[in-house]
């Protein structure tokens, strides 16, 4: 089994075990190991695989799934300019604190700045607009990588051979676990007047519908919401 196959399988298996169900894939050449791993996982009914050819649209599609589910949604692309198409969705995920996981395939580090076909400097490409940025050619512990919120970038270096014939059943014995839930900071609000209104912005700031309704009822205030509760 090649190092690229090992890296792809470890990454996808860990994400499945962390309870991630939806994956958005834009197929390409360098991310072929990830594509094969995802198709195999989908064939076993372990994930929901959404294929979108356009990377910009794929990233916003993943953003929408994350907003609906509250879970991290990986969006996967090949190397080169494909990665740059994620930036608009990354900005929105950053400012809205949406859990978007960017899995970008890359060539090995030794080919950077050499004039080799298609490499660009993908590591750190999203700057301060991601809450974590990782550049690796070997498997890493994703439970710590995703112990946060908002967009996270993992740049995966895949070397040749990208595809090998291997019939190993690498998806047996899946042990599901959950990502740790973030604790919200609580505060006490005492209205100074009886004429109050509760305005709920986009994404509810992470609060559950029941929490919002309970708070509004406790102060006798009407609710004005941007989205349906």
Question: Where is each model-derived feature located?
Answer:
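N-terminal alpha/beta PP-like core and its mobile active-site loop of ThDP/TPP-dependent enzymes
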Residues: 2-229
């Amino acid at each position: 089994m090649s190092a690229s196959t090992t890296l792809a399988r470890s990454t996808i298996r860990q994400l499945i075990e962390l309870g991630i169900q939806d994956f958005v894939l834009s197929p390409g050449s360098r991310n072929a190991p990830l594509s094969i791993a995802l198709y195999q996982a989908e064939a076993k009914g372990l994930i929901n695989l959404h294929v979108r050819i356009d990377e910009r649209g794929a990233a916003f599609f993943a953003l929408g799934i994350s907003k609906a589910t509250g879970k991290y949604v990986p969006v996967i692309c090949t190397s080169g300019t494909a990665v740059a198409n994620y930036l608009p969705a990354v900005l929105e995920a950053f400012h809205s604190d949406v859990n978007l996981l960017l899995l970008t395939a890359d060539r090995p580090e030794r080919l950077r700045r050499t004039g080799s076909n298609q490499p660009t400097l993908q590591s750190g490409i999203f700057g301060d607009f991601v809450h974590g940025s990782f550049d690796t050619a070997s498997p890493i512990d994703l439970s710590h990588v995703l112990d946060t919120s908002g967009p996270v970038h993992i740049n995966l270096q895949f070397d040749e051979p990208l595809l090998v014939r291997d019939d190993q059943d690498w998806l047996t014995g899946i042990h599901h676990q959950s990502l740790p839930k973030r604790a919200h900071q609580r505060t006490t609000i005492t209205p100074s007047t009886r004429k109050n209104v509760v305005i709920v912005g986009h994404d509810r700031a992470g609060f559950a519908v029941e929490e919002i309704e309970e708070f509004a009822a406790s102060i006798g205030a009407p609710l004005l919401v941007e989205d349906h509760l």
